[in-house]
Amino acid sequence: MTATITDINAHEILDSRANPTLEVRVTLSSQAYGCAAVPSGASTGEREAVELRDNNLERYGGKGVLQAVENVNGPIRDALLGQDPRSQEEIDRIMIELDGTENKANLGANAILGVSLAVAYAAANNADLPLYRYLGGDGGPFSMPVPMMNIINGGAHATNNLDFQEFMIVPVGAPTFAEALRYGAEVFHALKKRLVSRGLMSAVGDEGGFAPDLPNNEAAFELILEAIEDANYVPGKDIYLALDAASSELYQNGRYDFENNQLTSEEMIDRLTEWTKKYPVISIEDGLSENDWAGWKLLTERLENKVQLVGDDIFVTNPDILEKGIKKNIANAILVKLNQIGTLTETLATVGLAKSNKYGVIISHRSGETEDTTIADLAVATDARQIKTGSLCRSDRVAKYNRLLQIERELNDQAPYAGKEAFLFNRK
């Protein structure tokens, strides 16, 4: 007998920044159930689906999500009772139509996403399958993703003087995911030791990376290279560098406010190009603003065959916007964040569109996270080959890494570590 949805319940929990978010539980007639918690971003794209907040300044500084909880426990629950949880596309369609807006502003993308993911977990649990097998099929193909590890935080993720948001290490040369994690952890500790020895702050930012004040952004690269060598790895062979410039945060009146200079798009591109020549940079995310499409075209023409150019704010995990970018030859990879678009179905459509056009895919966390590990399963299920889930500390980040270790043990030879094959920029 087919199991159907018999109950949906949401409540407020806290995320990693002490802000409220939703956790949703979907229960089936078989007594199987699924739970999911929703993340939240700090630097958000203008075209992201809308996260519903209460704006009641007497609770959580206006950041409460009681209205979103009410939307789940009321109209969404009423609309989905009796549905087959395996009908993910239909369930997501019902919620989108019930919302009635292009950006999910009525019910809230946080409400809709929580239900969408909890439904998938309930269906997977009812089938006695882990989420990655339920979504990816029993035979895959599966691979273990290369982690992009954010070990120095700046921009909107920290309170230091660095303009760029994330300076990452990418352990491309590791033979397995478990070894990649070890590479990263050892560099993390080597970096901390260097910071302490220089009297620099070793406190961490939102995503678990260190947040020191440094003379300039290049100094972050230099520090990381020293830490890689201290840990006995070879930069540009064992471990590469990656950067999230989060340039939309720097863009005002057609210029980039960078290191106390007002740079044009061309000058920003020159700076990024210079760094790709000077350092072993394999990936640049949001090198230009989401509203600087002309600049993005120039950046892509300049660097598309040399480094991975990741669109985050410019694409916001939206298949329609990604399709426009593909036609205009903008970027060569996309960052995929579930809560930017608000349903599992639309997320999978975006991943499929990217892969069919040979765009790299990076499954990503948000700066406000929970212990939810959905993105780990999603990265394996979709054979995305890359994941971005923060640094090597803070349980909200490490939970995803530990889940990937579990999956690697379960799949063993069925899921080889993607390594350099994860990067498609030189094979388009």
From Swiss-Prot:
Species the sequence originates in: Coxiella burnetii (strain Dugway 5J108-111)
Example of a GO MF term: magnesium ion binding
Pathway participation: Carbohydrate degradation; glycolysis; pyruvate from D-glyceraldehyde 3-phosphate: step 4/5
Cofactor note: Binds a second Mg(2+) ion via substrate during catalysis.
Needed co-factor(s): Mg(2+)
Gene3D superfamilies reported for this sequence: Enolase-like C-terminal domain, Enolase-like, N-terminal domain
Binding sites annotated in the UniProt record for (2R)-2-phosphoglycerate: 165, 337, 366-367, 388
Keyword Transmembrane: no
GO terms, biological process: glycolytic process
Domain of life: Bacteria
Protein name: Enolase
Subunit structure: Component of the RNA degradosome, a multiprotein complex involved in RNA processing and mRNA degradation.
Function: Catalyzes the reversible conversion of 2-phosphoglycerate (2-PG) into phosphoenolpyruvate (PEP). It is essential for the degradation of carbohydrates via glycolysis.
EC number(s) per entry: 4.2.1.11
Subcellular location: Cytoplasm; Secreted; Cell surface
